[in-house]
Amino acid sequence: LGQQVGGNLFHSFGQFSIDTGESATFSGPNSVNNIIGRVTGGEASFIDGTIRSTIPGANLYLLNPAGLLFGENATLDVSGSVHVSTADYLRLGDGGRFDAHTPGNSVLTVAPVVAFGFLDPPAPITVNGGFLRVPDGQTLSLIGGDITLHNATLYAPAGRIDLVTVGSAGEVLPTDHDLVMQGFGTLGALTIERDPVVARVTVDIGEPLGEIPLGDLDTSGEGGGAIFIRGGQWVNRGGWVFTNTYGARAGR
């Protein structure tokens, strides 16, 4: 059931993986603004099913310092923003902290997440053939060690995509218009790669968009979105990064 503190609903798991065809559903009262989950057992999470939330508009944070791997059948069914990270802790406002590396150091508060904190060395995040989408105007974040997107698409129509790769201890502070990096001695590598021939998928956003090839970052929609990338090295093998405005709303 988790522990609710104000608008934050905290969950703690020893292990967290979703096999093909399975789902994990987060539920709670409509007063919840943020679902914040951590994995403390020291094993990487393999997600090849659906991560779902039944709480309208709630954002989802999933934290596993041991690593995160999304398979080709992984999907998101969340009406708010989604942030996945291999950070060791989340720093909350008002002196709060939700720690996956040392759970006993946690101090739960009603304040929102203000920073992703890393110890050395950060674990990787891999999306292998998946199509991860958030609703219109929401944010999709991958914040960890080396990040690899292989035949995968991240899609945030008229929203925002954050990709941060780090290689040492420090904190990442997302703001409305930037990603602030504090204390990092080294950064990680982002690899976007697509095989020469891959399947295509069609996404209907209410405006003509056509087919989105796998291996892309896309924030196109009624209003142009934003893509923020922070890292030490970026390797792009056949992938695309693009944001277009199809409607009357201004881009960002």
Regions found by a protein language model. Give the residues of each.
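Extracellular and secretory-pathway beta-repeat/beta-biased strand scaffolds
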Residues: 1-252
